[in-house]
Every structure is written in structure tokens, then in C-alpha cells.
């Protein structure tokens, strides 16, 4: 194997080790550390782009490099770089903890890169646990110790339960097939998928990924974790973490071949409940991060629609949706971070007058929310369209109808946020927001990207289709 194809992981590991060594020194320079994190994350992204197209195995076949994993590693590296751009003012992370913050951020990204390329049950489990434990600590790092610790503990408790269920499922699959490698499982599983023990084992295994994706009933941690974590950490959980969850979920589901009837039915039920619970719960939220958390639960349901189609069109739709989620969610959180410049939580009503305080942020928020709602011509609309078409191709018309009803429901609470930003007046005169030129430029680029990917999605769709074919 060409070790250049493993360069993204090596660079990310080296970056984490560098910040770890830096944390052992007495002196701290937040600005230099932020610049270093930007440079290192950009270097990792460049390595991911340079290694696209490489193929091979390493670690005795336990880790696989193919186009599918490379595409997701590019998304993860891009997500890390985007999050680091928001970390110039980490007002809600104590200065003495900021180097540890970067250590955990790079370690978590490394774990998620390993997760999307894992080809062995052991690597899947270890990577998932490493990324999860990094996130538990990141959530608890918030300056408001009570709120952050409470959220971190809730996140941890749900996580260890999901991990226990998952490892039992892995044991069932290994016992039924005698194989622990995913590519070997892909050859054996289609022939035994109709056995009840195999279906149960696969569902229990998937529950670990459902936890990461915030699928019902593994979503209870999400609202509290989003609300209790620092805003940059919440943004990271909502973007990079979800990209990794979609990647490993699609890889494992693809190993099941055409799948079993029971598996499809269970995934359909989880999809419907996730969409419905997420959207209905979001309507009642006044805290913007809790609203976005329940929105994430609903989007997990949309992703499952593509996955349960169990065909190349469904898998490629899920890959496209991962890209769309990364851009849409990050843009919404960028606005949140800039408006709540003191690092505190942001209520929807506090967006009043945003169109005057910062027109570019108001525009970015509006486009991101319209995209999350699936309004054309945005990347969110294209993502939902691809997912729905894949499902209808397999005859899941009722499921698509329920999803479309949920899209209408979601539009209501997204419009409430847009109404606050454009139509409500603040109770007192507020000064204009001071947004740095680089972040203004980034906001404009993201707006253009969301609209351009809606108008001209063909290139991204082709990449997603090629990535999906690498699984088959």
C-alpha cells in the first residue's frame, strides 16, 4: 500500500501530538495556537484531497482505503478546518484548557477518519469509542462547569449504553458468520441476512451508529449536549460527527446486500419516528441550539430513507446528504457563534434585528435554514430529492409521503427563526455586529455554495455515485 494514502491520518495524528506536547508547557498564546490549528487542519485537508483515488489496505486488512472512505475523509477534514475558523475567540473555553481543546478536536477527527475506513469489527468499535470519548470531554470543557458537565454526563451515559448494545450486536454477527472483516461480511451476510439472529445482530450493531447520528431512540443526548456544550463544540457535533456516522452506517448497511425484510421495516419505522419526533419537538424550542439539535434528529430520519433503499442510488444519495448537512449546519452555527459573541446560548428572539446588525449573517442564516427545510434551489432540496427518488425506486411511496409531510412541518419552525432575524425588532437598540472580513467572506462563499450546489449538483452527484460504487 502507498503510505501517501494514509497521509491524512498521519498529519491529523501528528497535529494532535503537537498540541499535546504544547499543553505540557507553561506559556500559552491563544492567537498563535489558533493560527497553528488553522494551518495544520488546512494541511490535513490538502492531504485528503491529494490522496483521493488511492486504494489499498493496511494493518493486516483491518483498514481500507477506497474512494468511499476518501470522500468522507475530505468532508471530515473540511469540517475540522471550518470549525477551527470559528475558534479565534473561544470565549466559552477557559484559556488554560484551549490546547487540550485542540488535542481533543484533532483526536476526534482522526478517530472518525479511521471509522469511515474501518474494515474490521475491532477497528469500528475502537474508532467509534475514541471519537465518542473525545466528544464527551469536549462537551464538558465549557466554562460554565455546571451546564457543560451535566450535558457531558448525559451524553456519556447514553453513549455507553449504545456502545454496550453495539458490541453485543457485533458478537452476534461474528457468531453467525465467523467473520470479523467487513468486506468478508459483505460476501457472507446476503446469504444469512434472513436469519433472525443476524437481523437482530445487525440492528444492535447499527444502534451504535444511530447514537452517533442521533436517530430515535438514541437521540435524547442531543438537545442537552448541544445546549450545554460551547458553541464551537456544538457545531462540530452537528457537522463532522454526523458525516462520520453517515459514512460508517452506509458502509455497514451495504455489507448486507439487498437486506432482509425485517431490517428494512425497522429502519423505516426509525426513520418515520425520527423525522416526526425531531420536527414536532423543534417547534416548541426557544433556544436555537436545542432547535438545531432536534432538527438534526429529523435529518437523521431523512438519511435513513436513502440508506434503507439498499441500492446504489440510495447510498449515493446518503453521501450527497452528508455533504449537504455539513454545509447547511455549519452555516447556521457560524451565525450562532458570531451573534452570541460572548459564548453564551442564543434564544431565537435574540436574533431580532439581525438583518440590520449584519446583513451577510442574516442572509447566511436564511439560506441555510431554507436549505435545511429543503426549499429549492438549495443543496438541501437536492439532497432530499435524491433520497426520495431512491426510496420511490424501491416502492417506499408511503414513507416518502410521510417525509414530505415532515418537510412541511419543519418549514414552520425554520420560518420562525427567519422571521425573528428579518421581521422582529429588538427591545432595545443594538450595535452592529463586528464580523471579521475572513468570516464575512466565508459566509458569502457558503451562501454561494448552498445555492450553486442546488442549481448545479451534477459534479457532486457524480462523486457521490462513484463513492457508492466503491462499496459494491
Swiss-Prot record:
It is an enzyme of class 7 (translocase). The keyword Glycoprotein does not apply. One of its GO terms (cellular component) is plasma membrane. One of its GO terms (biological process) is ATP synthesis coupled electron transport. The keyword Ligase does not apply. InterPro entries: NADH-Q_OxRdtase_suN/2, ND/Mrp_TM. It is a multi-pass membrane protein. Keywords: Cell inner membrane, Cell membrane, Membrane, NAD, Quinone, Translocase, Transmembrane, Transmembrane helix, Transport, Ubiquinone. HAMAP family: NDH1_NuoN_1 (MF_00445). GO terms for molecular function: NADH dehydrogenase (ubiquinone) activity; NADH:ubiquinone reductase (non-electrogenic) activity; quinone binding. This is NADH-quinone oxidoreductase subunit N 2. Belongs to the complex I subunit 2 family. NDH-1 shuttles electrons from NADH, via FMN and iron-sulfur (Fe-S) centers, to quinones in the respiratory chain. The immediate electron acceptor for the enzyme in this species is believed to be ubiquinone. Couples the redox reaction to proton translocation (for every two electrons transferred, four hydrogen ions are translocated across the cytoplasmic membrane), and thus conserves the redox energy in a proton gradient. It catalyses: a quinone + NADH + 5 H(+)(in) = a quinol + NAD(+) + 4 H(+)(out). The lineage of its organism: Bacteria, Pseudomonadati, Thermodesulfobacteriota, Syntrophobacteria, Syntrophobacterales. Its EC number is 7.1.1.-. Its main location: membrane. The gene is nuoN2. It is found in: Cell inner membrane. The chain crosses the membrane at residues 3-23, 34-54, 67-87, 106-126, 156-176, 198-218, 233-253, 263-283, 291-311, 317-337, 360-380, 398-418, 441-461. Pfam families: Proton_antipo_M (PF00361). NDH-1 is composed of 14 different subunits. Subunits NuoA, H, J, K, L, M, N constitute the membrane sector of the complex. It comes from the Bacteria.
Amino acid at each position: 500500500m502507498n503510505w501517501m494514502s494514509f497521509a491524512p491520518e498521519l498529519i491529523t495524528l501528528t497535529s494532535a501530538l503537537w498540541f499535546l506536547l504544547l499543553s505540557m508547557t507553561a506559556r500559552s498564546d491563544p492567537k498563535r495556537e489558533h493560527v497553528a490549528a488553522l494551518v495544520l487542519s488546512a494541511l490535513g485537508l490538502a492531504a485528503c484531497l491529494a490522496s483521493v483515488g488511492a486504494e489499498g489496505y493496511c494493518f493486516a486488512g483491518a483498514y481500507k482505503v477506497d474512494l468511499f472512505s476518501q470522500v468522507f475523509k475530505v468532508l471530515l477534514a473540511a469540517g475540522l478546518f471550518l470549525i477551527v475558523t470559528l475558534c479565534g475567540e473561544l470565549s466559552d473555553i477557559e484559556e488554560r484548557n484551549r490546547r487540550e481543546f485542540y488535542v481533543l478536536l484533532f483526536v476526534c477527527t482522526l478517530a472518525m477518519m479511521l471509522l469511515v475506513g474501518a474494515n474490521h469489527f475491532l477497528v469500528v468499535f475502537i474508532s467509534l469509542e475514541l471519537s465518542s470519548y473525545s466528544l464527551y470531554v469536549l462537551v464538558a470543557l465549557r466554562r460554565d462547569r455546571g451546564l457543560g458537565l451535566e450535558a457531558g454526563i448525559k451524553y456519556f451515559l447514553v453513549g455507553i449504553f449504545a456502545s454496550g448494545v453495539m458490541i453485543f450486536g457485533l458478537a452476534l454477527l461474528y457468531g453467525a458468520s465467523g467473520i470479523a472483516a467487513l468486506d468478508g461480511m459483505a460476501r457472507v451476510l446476503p446469504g444469512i441476512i434472513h436469519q433472525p439472529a443476524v437481523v437482530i445482530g445487525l440492528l444492535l450493531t447499527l444502534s451504535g451508529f444511530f447514537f452517533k447520528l442521533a436517530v430515535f431512540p438514541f437521540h435524547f443526548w442531543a438537545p442537552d449536549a448541544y445546549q450545554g456544550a460551547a458553541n464551537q463544540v456544538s457545531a462540530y457535533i452537528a457537522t463532522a460527527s454526523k458525516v462520520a456516522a453517515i459514512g460508517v452506517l452506509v458502509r455497514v448497511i451495504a455489507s448486507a446486500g439487498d437486506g432482509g425484510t425485517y431490517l428494512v421495516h425497522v429502519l423505516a419505522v426509525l426513520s418515520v419516528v425520527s423525522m416526526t419526533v425531531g420536527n414536532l419537538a423543534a417547534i416548541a424550542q426557544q433556544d436555537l441550539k436545542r432547535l438545531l439539535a432536534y432538527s438534526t434528529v429529523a435529518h437523521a430520519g431523512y438519511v435513513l430513507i436513502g440508506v434503507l433503499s439498499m441500492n446504489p442510488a440510495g447510498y449515493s444519495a446518503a453521501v450527497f446528504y452528508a455533504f449537504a448537512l455539513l454545509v447547511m449546519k455549519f452555516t447556521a452555527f457560524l451565525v450562532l457563534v458570531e451573534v452570541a459573541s460572548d459564548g453564551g446560548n442564543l434564544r431565537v428572539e435574540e436574533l431580532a434585528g439581525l438583518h440590520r446588525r449584519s446583513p451577510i449573517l442574516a442572509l447566511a442564516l436564511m439560506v441555510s435554514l431554507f436549505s435545511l427545510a429543503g426549499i429549492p434551489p438549495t443543496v438541501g432540496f437536492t439532497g432530499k430529492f435524491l433520497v426520495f427518488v431512491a426510496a420511490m425506486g424501491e416502492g417506499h411511496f408511503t414513507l416518502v409521503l410521510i417525509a414530505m409531510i415532515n418537510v412541511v412541518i419543519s418549514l414552520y419552525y425554520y420560518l420562525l427563526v427567519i422571521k425573528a432575524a428579518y421581521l422582529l425588532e429588538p427591545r432595545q437598540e443594538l450595535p452592529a455586529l463586528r464580523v471579521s472580513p475572513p468570516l464575512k467572506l466565508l459566509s458569502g462563499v457558503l451562501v454561494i455554495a448552498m445555492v450553486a450546489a442546488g442549481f448545479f449538483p451534477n459534479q457532486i452527484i457524480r462523486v457521490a455515485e462513484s463513492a457508492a460504487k466503491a462499496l459494491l
